[in-house]
């Protein structure tokens, strides 16, 4: 929510502890509205709240959202927790983001290999290389050799990104003519 400038009044934790029957109308009451028209089910405010949300509940929420919206985006942490696996299991497409530093590339390689072992279709994964023009000792052209897969999209470093994050707007809204916005629009 922070990157979208949304202040959570209700979160998925509040939905989980609200009791009663879970359906699309109930979920609607817990969605935050972005000025662009996008709606967001906000993350829990504290780690203890996140721990109280079970994966069966998440799976049910994801299925209801998928039946209701054309696109459901789930921003996950970079680890294969039970919650992340629940999101992956109901996904039709994944976007894996990595950067040019050695640790990120190692984690990206492990993540892509894990998804393959889980039986996820590699053609349904978009690999985005973020800050692809950074001079960190690894060239973007080396990534395919290191990971066994070329990035589907490269996004260069752009000062417009932190400005957009600070303003709470997506880069394509805050600075639509920026290089980064052009890259993300092609996604």
Map each language-model feature to its residues:
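C-terminal boundary of histidine-terminating zinc-finger modules
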Residues: 12, 167-184
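Residue-level signature of the cytosolic catalytic core of signaling kinases
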Residues: 8, 20-23, 54, 157, ...
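Flexible beta-alpha connector loops of hexameric P-loop NTPases
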Residues: 12-20, 45-53, 100-103
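Phosphate-binding loop that captures ATP/GTP phosphates
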Residues: 1-40
């Amino acid at each position: 929510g922070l990157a979208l400038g949304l202040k959570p009044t209700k979160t998925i934790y509040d939905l989980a502890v609200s009791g009663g029957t879970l359906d699309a109308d109930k979920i609607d009451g817990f969605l935050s509205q972005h000025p662009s028209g996008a709606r967001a089910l906000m993350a829990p405010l504290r780690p203890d709240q996140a721990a109280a949300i079970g994966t069966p509940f998440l799976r049910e929420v994801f299925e209801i959202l998928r039946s209701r919206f054309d696109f459901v985006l789930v921003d996950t942490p970079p680890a294969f927790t039970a919650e992340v696996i629940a999101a992956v299991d109901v996904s039709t497409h994944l976007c894996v983001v990595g950067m040019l530093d050695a640790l990120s590339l190692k984690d990206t390689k492990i993540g892509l290999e894990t998804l393959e072992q889980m039986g996820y279709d590699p053609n349904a994964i978009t690999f985005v290389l973020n800050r692809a023009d950074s001079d960190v000792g690894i060239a973007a052209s080396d990534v395919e050799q290191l990971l066994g897969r070329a990035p589907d999209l490269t996004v260069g470093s752009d000062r417009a990104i932190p400005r957009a994050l600070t303003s709470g707007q997506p880069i394509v809204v805050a600075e639509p003519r920026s290089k980064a916005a052009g890259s993300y629009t092609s996604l």
